[in-house]
Amino acid sequence: MVEIGAHLQHGVIVADLAREDIRHRAMDRGEIVILKQAFDPDLLTAVRTATFAWGQVIPAGDVDDFSGNYHRRRAMISRLQQAPHIFHDYNFNALGAAPAALQGLLLRLFEPLRGLFRDLTGIETSFVAPATGAYVHPQLIQYPNGGGFFGRHWHNLHPQQLGFIVSLSKRGLDYRNGGTCFEIDGDVIDLGDRQDIGDITVWRYDHQHWVTQSDLKEKFDWDRADGRWVATYAYFDPFA
């Protein structure tokens, strides 16, 4: 694992390591690369707060809507990988149709990620779902205090190539424990106390990984805004 300083400059993620070196470390060497402090914590808190408020107004969905904006409260076992999980995801496949204030905040997060993804993978994405083929699925995930987690699972390397996990919460303030773990060449890498709010974790997309359980001392409640929040930049064809 390597930690690299980063910041946002005029809507572009600037890192203390060249793009080709970030890609080489993550893709070719299989390292976990953390871009430290890439986003301002106040922005991410605002994104998280506005997204949660939207989810309190819009009823939770029972099925995935890969062409629309929706959120789901999941307490289940995934069909393909049989990975148990409890989390609340917020999905913006039609980002342009989101309420204006929320859309503006989300774009301040996902536009810089779009540029970073293009630079690292060579894939140009947009926030409009095409008729066919792979496209980006902007997503926020909340692991509620009281038991949120995601069991060990993996993804196909292509077409994504590299995954992003943006930390939207402050450890010790919004949540006490829980974090993403990877297994690489038989070694477990636990990011629980390494990834802070504003950091972007860049990782090779076929690494085995899981999310450890949030604090069981807390009472679980879908309608609470606290817990561990992350943003992801998933790129796939849901109908392939």
List where the protein language model places each region.
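Catalytic core of Fe(II)/2-oxoglutarate
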Residues: 160, 169-240
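Cytochrome P450 catalytic domain signature, combining two hallmark sequence patches
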Residues: 52-64
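Fe(II)/2-oxoglutarate
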Residues: 1-30
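Signature of the catalytic double-stranded beta-helix
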Residues: 39, 74-137
